[in-house]
């Protein structure tokens, strides 16, 4: 049963709070999300709330309250695996048109020993999303949900196609598309992995999102996490300069930064990481995971993989993490993980 808005707070009063720049208590953010999922708000009300939240700027409390509702609405086909897990899902929206870096990182981190539950979707902007490129490489997006979970245990990596796990959001999709702007739902995507990993590397396209996203992960109970805003505005750690970070460890947040040059990597502009259409991004991802691609492409994957290995508790030294990732890439081990996942899901589809 959806939570009722408190007697003193009607929907119009909550909207007025947002329009005046006031932050919502977590309980009211929770009630708002529950009302959305229960279709209790009109399209006009929903559009107004989304616009007001975007204009005000979201807080960690608001994000965590909404995320908990969405997590609870996920259809879990089986008990959650009792293993440590890490996700590499970011917010997107940086406009840099890079290749699918976080997707490459997911398979590289798995090859380095992490259990990676990669949450992702198709692109909403006409670019190439993680689901688009993986489907193009033969990965089944419509595999039974239980098979997706089993693949994580079997292969060490899996891909959770967001629409399959969040059916409650289907009714909101047309309105979100009609608004034509990014909303709080774009920020919630990385926070609502159905398998609830205990670690995450989460890239944000804007520096002002570092704190609220990190605070949301903290409130959601993650053990370790990195929220990163890349030099040049990338929603990954980039090779262009100093990358701003918030590190979550044992319930505590701290600021940090890392420059790729400090880890022995050659600086490179964002243009060196450019992707393209689906065929181009498939070719780049295939090449990099098999030890090919350009030096900047491999280096940016190694850099971000090092952050994942830190978050997963596998490597506290980032320099060593970069070295481990480079070795895995040179040996083509990430491609083996992708092939293993593809075969595991194909097997289930065929049964």
From Swiss-Prot:
Cofactor(s) required for function per UniProt: Mg(2+)
Binding-site list for Mg(2+) 1: 102, 236
Gene3D superfamilies to which the protein is assigned, alphabetical: Nucleoside phosphorylase/phosphoribosyltransferase catalytic domain, Transferase, Pyrimidine Nucleoside Phosphorylase, Chain C
GO cellular component, one term: cytosol
UniProt keyword terms in alphabetical order: Amino-acid biosynthesis, Aromatic amino acid biosynthesis, Glycosyltransferase, Magnesium, Metal-binding, Transferase, Tryptophan biosynthesis
Family: Belongs to the anthranilate phosphoribosyltransferase family.
Lineage of origin: Bacteria, Bacillati, Cyanobacteriota, Cyanophyceae, Synechococcales
Binding positions (5-phospho-alpha-D-ribose 1-diphosphate): 90, 93-94, 98, 100-103, 118-126, 130
Record text on subunit structure and interactions: Homodimer.
Top-level class of the enzyme under EC nomenclature: transferase
Entry note: cofactor: Binds 2 magnesium ions per monomer.
Binding site for anthranilate 1: 90, 121
Disulfide bonds: none
Function of the protein: Catalyzes the transfer of the phosphoribosyl group of 5-phosphorylribose-1-pyrophosphate (PRPP) to anthranilate to yield N-(5'-phosphoribosyl)-anthranilate (PRA).
Binding residues for Mg(2+) 2: 235-236
UniProt superkingdom: Bacteria
Source species: Prochlorococcus marinus (strain MIT 9313)
One of the GO biological process terms: L-tryptophan biosynthetic process
Pathway: Amino-acid biosynthesis; L-tryptophan biosynthesis; L-tryptophan from chorismate: step 2/5
Residues annotated for anthranilate 2 binding in this entry: 176
Transmembrane segments: none
Catalytic activity: N-(5-phospho-beta-D-ribosyl)anthranilate + diphosphate = 5-phospho-alpha-D-ribose 1-diphosphate + anthranilate
EC number: 2.4.2.18
InterPro entries registered for this protein in UniProt: Anthranilate_Pribosyl_Tfrase, Glycosyl_Trfase_fam3, Glycosyl_Trfase_fam3_N_dom, Glycosyl_Trfase_fam3_N_dom_sf, Nuc_phospho_transferase
GO molecular-function term, one example from the UniProt record: anthranilate phosphoribosyltransferase activity
Gene label: trpD
Name of the protein in its database record: Anthranilate phosphoribosyltransferase
């Amino acid at each position: 049963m959806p939570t009722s808005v408190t007697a003193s707070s009607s929907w119009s009063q909550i909207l007025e709070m947002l329009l005046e720049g006031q932050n919502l208590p977590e309980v009211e953010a929770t009630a708002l999300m529950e009302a959305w999922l229960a279709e209790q708000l009109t399209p006009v009300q929903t559009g107004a709330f989304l616009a007001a939240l975007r204009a005000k700027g979201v807080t960690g409390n608001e994000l965590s309250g909404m995320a908990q509702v969405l997590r609870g609405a996920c259809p879990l086909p089986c008990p959650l695996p009792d293993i440590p897990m890490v996700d590499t899902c970011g917010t997107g929206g940086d406009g840099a048109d890079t290749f699918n870096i976080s997707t490459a990182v997911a398979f590289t981190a798995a090859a380095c020993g992490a259990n990676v539950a990669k949450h992702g979707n198709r692109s909403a902007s006409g670019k190439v999303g993680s689901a688009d490129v993986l489907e193009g490489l033969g990965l089944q997006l419509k595999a039974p949900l239980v098979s997706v979970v089993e693949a994580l245990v079997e292969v060490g990596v899996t891909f959770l196609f967001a629409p399959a796990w969040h059916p409650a959001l289907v009714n909101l999709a047309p309105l979100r598309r009609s608004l034509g702007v990014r909303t709080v739902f774009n920020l919630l995507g990385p926070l609502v992995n159905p398998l609830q990993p205990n670690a995450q590397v989460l890239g944000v396209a804007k520096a002002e999102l570092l704190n609220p996203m990190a605070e949301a992960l903290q409130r959601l109970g993650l053990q370790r996490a990195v929220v990163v805003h890349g030099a040049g505005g990338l929603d990954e750690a980039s090779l262009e300069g100093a990358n701003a970070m918030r590190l979550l460890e044992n319930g505590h947040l701290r600021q940090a930064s890392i420059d790729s040059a400090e880890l022995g990597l050659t600086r490179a502009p964002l243009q060196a990481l450019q992707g393209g259409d689906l065929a181009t991004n498939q070719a780049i991802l295939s090449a990099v995971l098999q030890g090919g691609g350009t030096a900047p492409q491999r280096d940016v994957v190694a850099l971000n993989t090092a952050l994942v290995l830190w978050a997963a508790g596998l490597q506290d030294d980032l320099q060593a993490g970069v070295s481990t990732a480079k070795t895995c890439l040179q040996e083509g081990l990430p491609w083996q993980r992708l092939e293993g996942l593809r075969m595991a899901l194909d097997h289930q589809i065929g049964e």
